[in-house]
Amino acid sequence: MGAMGAAEPLHSVLWVKRRRCAVSLEPARALLRWWRSPEPGPSAPGADARSVLVSEIIAVEEKDDCEKHASSGRWHKMENPFAFTVHRVKRVRHHRWKWARVTFWSADEQLCHLWLQTLRGLLESLTSRPKHLLVFINPFGGKGQGKRIYEKTVAPLFTLASITTEIIITEHANQAKETLYEINTDSYDGIVCVGGDGMFSEVLHGVIGRTQQSAGIDPNHPRAVLVPSTLRIGIIPAGSTDCVCYSTVGTNDAETSALHIIIGDSLAIDVSSVHYHNTLLRYSVSLLGYGFYGDLIKDSEKKRWMGLVRYDFSGLKTFLSHQYYEGTLSFLPAQHTVGSPRDNKPCRAGCFVCRQSKQQLEEEEKKALYGLENAEEMEEWQVTCGKFLAINATNMSCACPRSPGGLSPFAHLGDGSSDLILIRKCSRFNFLRFLIRHTNQEDQFDFTFVEVYRVKKFHFTSKHVEDEDNDSKEQEKQKFGKICKDRPSCTCSASRSSWNCDGEVMHSPAIEVRVHCQLVRLFARGIEEES
């Protein structure tokens, strides 16, 4: 809060909507309050008292002219009224925020000026607020409304908050990523992306890649310790999927996201690096899915002409195909975290699990640095293999309007782990039951064919790679293929799936995944508990 605690408390009687109100500002609590005060003297706040945290005030404006309100007789007795307007955050239902304002009036010009200067001084002391932002707008994503959403909803709020911007409307894929590699980002307080999860992924890769490049880190090395970026990323949802925004804010509302950016919220989230043969393939923050979700996204890419309905169509087609895939998974359980995938403790703003897990990881890193012990060598990898309908790794709940709980309702945003969900081969009916549970309050992990682990690393190799690496299995493969050929009704998987990496198709028969704890920061605070 900076110098906030040094300011003196203010108590005055002002007018709000033609009603006399007692108004107080308590810098120590960073709180502005007002309540009705029928009598001129001091009064205690009642049930009708309103308040706003100074940190959630957007701006304070001087009001020069007297608005033509339908006034009471008392109002007409006030000569030459002066006023100031406080623009603030107002919470509404379902985690949405709205811009609201309240105007305070007084006949005393000096009193109004004192309030104006005091509030502005407190706002200037909030050093976490951005002043200059670089904005990338995807005009093609979702329903093609990105530019309109920014101009109509976001830009006026940024102007009100005295935030200056440089805007780039992207014209081709990966333009945002390429731009962030090329330009000097030192003059910006953050990067804002207007679009869906694909647009966010571009900015994420650009920010992480540029940071590692500047630090001299080779991101292709699977064991490289990546350097966190100081640049925060803001997401204005305007895409076909807004999973990251929904999971970190609680809604996919553009105005809500803009207000989180304005007040300078900051939330550190985990990022997974995905490698194959010492080559970085991609980074992931939400879903890394093989099998069902991989096939779904691959099929939907061929049907972009269908618009958003392509996801429903491809989902139904993939479900009916009921394809399963064979492979081997090895994973390192996340011993450092205090939570588990089925503990009924969702990640919320100011999350205790994320704080404690981060501290525990830092302690482990210190011990390894001084050679006291290597936690990874002491922990045991677990190995499992079989036939899977889906393999999902989630760094967050992956919640969305259709699935408010998400793929893993109790996954955490910054605990340095990923929830690894294995859906083994089962009947089509049972798989449907599993999918339906994502839309209600029932436990989707409560099936014999579903396993879930909280991990910090995992490797996957498809059966095809294993067979290719082992020449001695060639005859067995031919025998396996002959059996399938002789029995057309056989549903054995003869192909390999693709990966769904945050909504993008990724082709790799084997991958190595590592979670990097709280690697990037967003203009968000996590989902708040609703009263």
Curated annotation (Swiss-Prot):
Residues bound to substrate: 195-198
Membrane topology label: Peripheral membrane protein
Region described as Essential for enzyme activity: 1-115
Any Gene Ontology biological process: ceramide metabolic process
Catalytic residues identified in the record: 197 (proton donor/acceptor)
SMART domains: DAGKc (SM00046)
Catalytic activity line of the entry: an N-acylsphing-4-enine + ATP = an N-acylsphing-4-enine 1-phosphate + ADP + H(+); N-(hexanoyl)sphing-4-enine + ATP = N-hexanoylsphing-4-enine 1-phosphate + ADP + H(+); N-(acetyl)-sphing-4-enine + ATP = N-(acetyl)-sphing-4-enine-1-phosphate + ADP + H(+); N-hexadecanoylsphing-4-enine + ATP = N-(hexadecanoyl)-sphing-4-enine-1-phosphate + ADP + H(+)
Keywords from the named record: ATP-binding, Calcium, Cell membrane, Cytoplasm, Kinase, Lipid metabolism, Magnesium, Membrane, Nucleotide-binding, Phosphoprotein, Transferase
Binding residues annotated for ATP, in chain numbering: 138-140, 170-174, 202, 239-241, 304, 310, 502-504
Top EC class, one word: transferase
Superkingdom of the source species: Eukaryota
Cofactor(s) required for function per UniProt: Ca(2+); Mg(2+)
GO molecular function: ATP binding; ceramide kinase activity; magnesium ion binding
EC number, UniProt record: 2.7.1.138
Domain spans labelled DAGKc: 128-278
Ranges where the record places region Required for binding to sulfatide and phosphoinositides: 1-125
Chief place where the protein resides: cytoplasm
Residues recorded as bearing Phosphoserine in the entry: 340, 408
InterPro entries listed in its UniProt record: ATP-NAD_kinase_N, CERK_C, Diacylglycerol_kinase_cat_dom, Lipid_Phosphate_FormReg, NAD/diacylglycerol_kinase_sf
Subcellular location: Cytoplasm; Cell membrane
This protein's GO CC annotations: membrane; mitochondrion; plasma membrane
Keyword Iron listed: no
Its job: Catalyzes specifically the phosphorylation of ceramide to form ceramide 1-phosphate. Acts efficiently on natural and analog ceramides (C6, C8, C16 ceramides, and C8-dihydroceramide), to a lesser extent on C2-ceramide and C6-dihydroceramide, but not on other lipids, such as various sphingosines. Shows a greater preference for D-erythro isomer of ceramides. Binds phosphoinositides.
Protein name: Ceramide kinase
The species this protein was found in: Mus musculus
